[in-house]
């Protein structure tokens, strides 16, 4: 049985294979794992085009195998960044591109959902590539905790159980 590769490029060595090179291959796998768990890289966007991020089976350096990807470059039209259909992971994405145009992050094919940095929106997003469908997988945005902290109109959708003192500075109606 020959070695196989995970969707993010880690080599799964077959029993008894790679005599004499096992240590080198294992070290490469550990470096790939390090990229996946916390690596940072930059990806220049193509002006109004598509950048296809690809896996490098058994090799380090694949942009899509890094945890954080920063998009750079000057764009004058919508730029799209794609990943292969079988990738299931989460990313920290940063849009540092110049130009007031959309940057779309999605799977390479299919009609699943994507995420978009709209026009002048720069900054960060946390996204989850679900690989939830063989032909139409979704990309989901995970909100930052700041969205909860900055909520000026919080609402409670159920009963509130207070185990201690309730402190307030307004009117309490029961």
Where are these regions (language model features)?
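Short, surface-exposed terminal/edge motifs of secreted or surface/virion proteins that either
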Residues: 30-39, 99-108, 113-114, 126-144
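Intrinsic low-complexity, repeat-rich intrinsically disordered segments enriched
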Residues: 41-52, 111-113, 145-174
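Tight coil/turn sites that cap or link beta-strands
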Residues: 86-88, 120-124
């Amino acid at each position: 049985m020959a070695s196989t590769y995970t969707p993010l490029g880690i080599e799964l060595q077959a029993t008894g294979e790679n005599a004499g090179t096992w240590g080198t291959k294992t070290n490469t796998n550990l470096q790939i794992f390090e990229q996946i768990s916390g690596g940072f890289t930059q990806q220049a966007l193509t002006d109004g085009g598509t950048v296809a991020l690809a896996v490098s089976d058994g090799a380090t350096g694949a942009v899509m195998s890094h945890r954080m990807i920063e998009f750079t470059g000057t764009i004058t039209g919508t730029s799209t960044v794609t990943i292969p259909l079988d990738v299931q992971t989460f990313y920290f994405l940063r849009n540092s591109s110049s130009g007031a145009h959309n940057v779309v992050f999605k799977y390479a094919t299919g009609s699943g959902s994507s995420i978009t940095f709209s026009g002048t929106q720069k900054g960060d997003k946390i996204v989850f590539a679900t690989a939830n469908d063989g032909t139409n997988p979704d990309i989901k945005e995970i909100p930052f905790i700041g969205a909860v902290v900055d909520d000026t109109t919080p609402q409670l959708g159920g009963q509130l159980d207070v185990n201690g003192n309730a402190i307030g500075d307004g009117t309490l109606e029961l």
